[in-house]
């Protein structure tokens, strides 16, 4: 209950940040437009964001007879929840995410790299983790926050260019270029910090829930160590192109050498593994 309240407050903060940007850009009219825009974004995110995220990563449905579908069916039956659809992303970097507005409309995407690098037990641990996200309804929260954060980043960049080239500082309807520059930097950072606060506690809960579903926390712990190492060594092109979706993944897919990674939406892998190993 407390975690749900915290998440509601953080999502409201993202929406408020979008409205503030609208106010700076266009006064009271801009605030109204931003508020309407936020409503449309939330509505669209609820109904369509899962489809959009899967398209971003060119995910394709797995054949019904694929062994991964057999694993997820068994896990879902064990957890007493509908069986999610499983999609494959053609990328050698091992990773996975879940999406969808509710358990009845959920999907799990895995990369070819994950299937190539992990053992069947480790794959089971990862799928159980993602299924726990679905059961906890984290999937809806994640895609909504990703959609709003992406909109904030896009508007902030547009804000900067409009303030620099579309108006001058003597125009009372314009925004001073310095304000635009500050907004470009601060708004996406603030959105990222809010996303981080939403995501971190939910990752721990999904780890624990997934371990209970699979019956062996060591499977997920072993998988996390392999995924963490690979995602520091490899470059996930689609994730770098769409950084606002990074928090959807089981392991942060953004390159570890980037400064932005200091504000990771994921808790440290070492802490996650330690908690899993302490479960039994």
Swiss-Prot record:
Cofactor info, note text: Binds 1 zinc ion per subunit.
Entry membrane topology: Multi-pass membrane protein
GO molecular function: metalloendopeptidase activity; zinc ion binding
GO cellular component term of the entry, any: plasma membrane
TM helices/strands, residue ranges: 7-26, 30-49, 146-166, 178-198
EC nos: 3.4.24.-
Residue positions of the active site: 130
Pfam families membership: Peptidase_M48
Cofactor(s) in the UniProt record: Zn(2+)
UniProt record similarity statement: Belongs to the peptidase M48B family.
NCBIfam families, per the entry: PRK03001.1 (NF002826)
Protein name: Protease HtpX
Taxonomic source organism: Legionella pneumophila subsp. pneumophila (strain Philadelphia 1 / ATCC 33152 / DSM 7513)
Classification lineage: Bacteria, Pseudomonadati, Pseudomonadota, Gammaproteobacteria, Legionellales
């Amino acid at each position: 209950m407390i975690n749900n309240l915290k998440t509601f407050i953080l999502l409201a903060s993202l929406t408020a940040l979008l409205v503030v940007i609208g106010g700076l850009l266009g006064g009271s009219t801009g605030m109204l437009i931003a508020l309407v825009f936020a409503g449309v974004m939330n509505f669209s995110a609820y109904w369509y964001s899962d489809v959009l995220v899967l398209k971003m990563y060119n995910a394709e449905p797995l054949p019904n007879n694929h062994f991964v579908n057999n694993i997820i069916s068994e896990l879902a039956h064990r957890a007493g929840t509908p069986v999610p659809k499983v999609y494959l992303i053609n990328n050698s970097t091992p990773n996975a995410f879940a999406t969808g507005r509710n358990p009845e409309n959920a999907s799990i995407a895995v990369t070819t790299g994950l299937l190539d690098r992990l053992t069947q037990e480790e794959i089971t641990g990862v799928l159980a983790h993602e299924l726990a996200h679905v059961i906890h309804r984290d999937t809806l929260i994640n895609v909504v926050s990703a959609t709003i954060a992406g909109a904030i980043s896009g508007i902030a960049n547009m804000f900067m260019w409009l303030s620099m080239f579309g108006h001058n500082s003597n125009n009372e309807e314009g925004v001073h270029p310095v304000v635009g520059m500050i907004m470009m930097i601060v708004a996406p950072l603030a959105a990222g910090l809010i996303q981080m606060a939403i995501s971190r506690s939910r990752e721990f809960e999904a780890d624990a829930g997934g371990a209970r579903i699979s019956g062996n926390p060591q499977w997920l712990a072993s998988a996390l160590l392999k995924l963490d190492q690979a995602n520091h060594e490899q470059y996930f092109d689609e994730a770098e192109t769409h950084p606002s979706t990074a928090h959807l993944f089981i392991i942060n897919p953004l390159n570890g050498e980037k400064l932005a990674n200091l504000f990771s939406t994921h808790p440290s892998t070492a802490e996650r593994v330690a908690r899993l190993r302490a479960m039994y």
